């Protein structure tokens, strides 16, 4: 991966990317409110469960397939996997989050000098798929900018984990150093998670995160909340 591709990846995974990632907790806010997550050890268990049962088995393998579809200009496959990812979101909040982030990333790409000329952004069928999930725009941009697939997956994985830790620092609350320790604890596992995701067959893709689904459902009616999911 050349220097330009490396820095474009940093832009895609930056917390400053204006897609509203910081406004979503994916059910963690309710999990903290009800006492499921009270400290750093509870947080570690929560994140480890999501990594093993959702991110590794759904988001990352779908991202890989969206990347390949982008490289081969396969609109049918691109649309299929974008809709598949959205269909796996169990609650209204999680589906809204997926679509809102997908729409926001598409708007960002529309305003970038080279991306504005990509044919995919000019075609309604591609744009419909891009609006289903952030992963679609992430995959398209990664393919167009020459970011290697494994590095794209590593980058997305780190971005997801970092955002979840930032949420936990605000909610539990954890100290900033505690948050960094949590990121460090996971860092040795992330490459193996990416490798596992790359080796998955289509029929094995899916998510099984009942705790997150329950937390997300109950978050929809939580009386006082900071986050949109």
Swiss-Prot record:
UreD, UreF and UreG form a complex that acts as a GTP-hydrolysis-dependent molecular chaperone, activating the urease apoprotein by helping to assemble the nickel containing metallocenter of UreC. The UreE protein probably delivers the nickel. Transmembrane segments: none annotated. Disulfide bonds: none annotated. GO terms for molecular function: nickel cation binding. HAMAP family: UreF. The lineage of its organism: Bacteria, Pseudomonadati, Pseudomonadota, Gammaproteobacteria, Oceanospirillales. Belongs to the UreF family. Gene3D superfamilies: Urease accessory protein UreF. Required for maturation of urease via the functional incorporation of the urease nickel metallocenter. It comes from the Bacteria. It comes from Alcanivorax borkumensis (strain ATCC 700651 / DSM 11573 / NCIMB 13689 / SK2). Signal peptide: none annotated. This is Urease accessory protein UreF. Keywords: Chaperone, Cytoplasm, Nickel insertion. It is found in: Cytoplasm. GO terms for cellular component: cytoplasm.
């Amino acid at each position: 991966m050349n220097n330009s591709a490396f820095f474009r990846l940093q832009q895609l995974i930056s917390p400053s990317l204006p897609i509203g990632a910081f406004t979503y907790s994916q059910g963690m806010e309710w999990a903290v409110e009800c006492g499921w997550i009270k400290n750093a050890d509870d947080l570690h268990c929560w994140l480890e469960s999501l990594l093993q049962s959702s991110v590794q088995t759904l988001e990352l393998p779908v991202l890989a397939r969206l990347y390949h579809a982008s490289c081969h200009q396969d609109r049918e496959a691109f649309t299929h996997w974008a809709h598949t990812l959205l269909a796996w979101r169990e609650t209204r909040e999680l589906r809204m989050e997926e679509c809102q982030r997908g729409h926001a990333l598409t708007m960002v790409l529309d305003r970038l000098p080279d991306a504005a000329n990509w044919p995919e952004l000019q075609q309604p069928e591609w744009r419909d798929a891009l609006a289903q999930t952030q992963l679609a725009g992430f995959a398209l941009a990664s393919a167009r900018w020459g970011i290697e697939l494994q590095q794209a997956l590593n980058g997305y994985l780190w971005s997801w984990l970092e955002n979840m830790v930032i949420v936990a620092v605000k909610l539990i609350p954890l100290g900033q150093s505690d948050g960094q320790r949590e990121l460090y604890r996971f860092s040795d596992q992330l490459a193996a998670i990416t490798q596992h995701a790359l080796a998955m067959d289509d029929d094995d893709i899916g998510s099984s995160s009942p705790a997150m689904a329950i937390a997300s459902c109950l978050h929809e009616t939580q009386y006082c909340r900071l986050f949109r999911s």
